[in-house]
């Protein structure tokens, strides 16, 4: 092929490619016009995605038109079913660590709330740590004087379990200096008590919205559990106290559905005292282990049926589990009457396991330090001293505090029984330490079918903080 023929051949090929390119562009333009004139019913690339924006989950439908995205927000459907919670408690051989927030250690340099009374409650999809803030941060001037229980600055807030009570992840729940919270399978219900001592009010929120209220009926510091309430088949139960902390007070059981109170009953308990009950579901009933702040070093027991009938008495075991208390050897136990003359007390818990009982208590008999959980054979029904298992959670030189119960629902565990769990508060600062503030962190344990070794999961913060040295 001579040079002229080569030039003609290359030119013809180039012209052919050019013509093909023009044809393709014309076809592309025609198709685009036809599709855009088809009102969104033509070719597209659609999909539904889930995105997280700073702790908030949004479900979005993304429609893509070549280089253009249309994002349509889809309302998240609420959970459709109430939790059953009529299953029995699982048998626990020991308790394994579930979470530890280390809030005070982190708070020495992080934006962490000053808190007290932390507790845990679970929905079908997650567990959350609730806590009562003091409207102030650790290592800040507003933390001064936060040893006080009741103030207009206290609020109930929550984080996902294991997170510290920090300002970036905490969710506001209620204005409160006493509270309880639980999930019925559809939405969270919170009960927050606030206001003056003689006219306090409890506001019942459901799904974050105020739905009902309870006014003080005795005019003497209306208060509630400081731990999880209990929902069974959509009905939620909790216990409240109104009256003196050191003599006879008045006690009531409340029942709500969708946050609206549908029943209540007074508890007749002459000579006994009930405060800060730690409750859990078990075989269709609500079982509570409470605090006697009047005289008893044994703990009140309250069992609530769905119709609000109840039985009330004391933990039968011949081993005391309140603080302060006397020697184990000098305690006889009673199923019906308070025993001891130590007064005061601390919030605690227990779990019935058939006729046995797992019961938590401080290791110290006189102060809120150390923590252990012991299993007492036949301790739910008899004055038994037969301690068949012991597990140390916090060793004695380290501070503890309140403790309480909750359960893992079957929706979370896929078991046929409710896993018993508990949390232990570790109080730091005033009145035991040289600081201007009082706050706490917590350790959470859940029942397993294996024995777990004792250890000390104590708070570990080094005090005082910088603010305490000014």
From Swiss-Prot:
Region spans: Involved in apical transport and lipid raft association? 11-32
Tell me what controls its activity. Answer: Inhibited by the neuraminidase inhibitors zanamivir (Relenza) and oseltamivir (Tamiflu). These drugs interfere with the release of progeny virus from infected cells and are effective against all influenza strains. Resistance to neuraminidase inhibitors is quite rare.
**Intravirion side: which ranges?**
1-14
Q: What is its EC number?
A: 3.2.1.18
Query: What segment(s) does the record annotate as region Head of neuraminidase?
Result: 89-470
- Record Pfam families: Neur
Topology of this chain in the membrane: Single-pass type II membrane protein
UniProt xrefs under Gene3D superfamilies: 2.120.10.10
**What residue intervals traverse the membrane?**
15-35
List this protein's GO terms for biological process: carbohydrate metabolic process; viral budding from plasma membrane
Positions of region (Hypervariable stalk region): 32-86
Question: Which keywords accompany this UniProt record?
Answer: Calcium, Disulfide bond, Glycoprotein, Glycosidase, Host cell membrane, Host membrane, Hydrolase, Membrane, Metal-binding, Signal-anchor, Transmembrane, Transmembrane helix, Virion
**Which reaction equation describes what this protein catalyses?**
Hydrolysis of alpha-(2->3)-, alpha-(2->6)-, alpha-(2->8)- glycosidic linkages of terminal sialic acid residues in oligosaccharides, glycoproteins, glycolipids, colominic acid and synthetic substrates
How this chain assembles, per its entry, is: Homotetramer.
As for what it does, the entry says: Catalyzes the removal of terminal sialic acid residues from viral and cellular glycoconjugates. Cleaves off the terminal sialic acids on the glycosylated HA during virus budding to facilitate virus release. Additionally helps virus spread through the circulation by further removing sialic acids from the cell surface. These cleavages prevent self-aggregation and ensure the efficient spread of the progeny virus from cell to cell. Otherwise, infection would be limited to one round of replication.
* Recorded family membership: Belongs to the glycosyl hydrolase 34 family.
Please give the HAMAP family that the UniProt record associates with this protein: INFV_NRAM
In Swiss-Prot or TrEMBL terms, this protein is called Neuraminidase
Q: Which organism is it from?
A: Influenza A virus (strain A/Equine/Santiago/1/1985 H3N8)
Gene transcribed to yield this protein: NA
């Amino acid at each position: 092929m001579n040079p002229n023929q080569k030039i003609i051949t290359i030119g013809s090929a180039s012209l052919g490619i050019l013509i093909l390119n023009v044809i393709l562009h014309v076809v592309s333009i025609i198709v685009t016009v036809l599709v855009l004139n088809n009102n969104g019913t033509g070719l597209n690339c659609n999909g539904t995605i889930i995105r997280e924006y700073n702790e908030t989950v949004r479900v979005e439908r993304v429609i893509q038109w070549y280089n253009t995205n249309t994002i349509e927000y889809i309302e998240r459907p609420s959970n459709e079913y109430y939790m059953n919670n009529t299953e029995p408690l699982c048998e626990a051989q020991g308790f394994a660590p579930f979470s530890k927030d280390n809030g005070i250690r982190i708070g020495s340099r992080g934006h962490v709330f000053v808190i007290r009374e932390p507790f845990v409650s679970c929905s079908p999809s997650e567990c959350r740590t609730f806590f009562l803030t003091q409207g102030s941060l650790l290592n800040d001037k507003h933390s001064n004087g936060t040893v006080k229980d009741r103030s207009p600055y206290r609020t109930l807030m929550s984080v996902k379990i294991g997170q510290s009570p920090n300002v970036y992840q905490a969710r506001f729940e209620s204005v409160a200096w006493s509270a309880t919270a639980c999930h019925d399978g559809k939405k969270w219900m919170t009960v927050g008590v606030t206001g003056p001592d003689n006219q306090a009010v409890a506001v019942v929120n459901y799904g974050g919205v105020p739905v009902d209220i309870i006014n003080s009926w005795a005019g003497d510091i209306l208060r509630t559990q400081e731990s999880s309430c209990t929902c069974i088949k959509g009905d939620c139960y909790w216990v409240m106290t109104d009256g003196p902390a050191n003599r006879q007070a008045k006690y009531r059981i409340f029942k709500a559905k969708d946050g609206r109170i549908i029943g209540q009953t007074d508890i007749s308990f002459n000579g006994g005292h009930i405060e800060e009950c730690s409750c859990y579901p078990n075989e269709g009933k609500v079982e509570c282990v409470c605090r006697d702040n009047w005289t008893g070093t044994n703990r009140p027991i309250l069992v609530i049926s769905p119709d609000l009938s109840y039985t009330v008495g004391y933990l039968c075991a011949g081993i005391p589990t309140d603080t302060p208390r006397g020697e184990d050897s000098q305690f006889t136990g009673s199923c019906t009457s308070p025993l001891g003359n130590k007064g005061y007390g601390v919030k605690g818990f227990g779990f019935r396991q058939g006729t046995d009982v797992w019961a938590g208590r401080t290791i110290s008999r006189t102060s809120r330090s150390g923590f252990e959980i012991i299993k007492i054979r036949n301790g739910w029904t008899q004055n038994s001293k037969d301690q068949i298992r012991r597990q140390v959670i916090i060793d004695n030189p380290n501070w503890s505090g309140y403790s309480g119960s909750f359960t893992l629902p079957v929706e979370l565990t896929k078991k046929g029984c409710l896993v018993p769990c508990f949390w232990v508060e570790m109080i730091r600062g005033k009145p035991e330490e040289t600081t201007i503030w009082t706050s706490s962190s917590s350790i959470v344990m859940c029942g397993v079918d294996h024995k777990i070794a004792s250890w000390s999961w104590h708070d570990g913060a080094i005090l005082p903080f910088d603010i305490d040295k000014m």
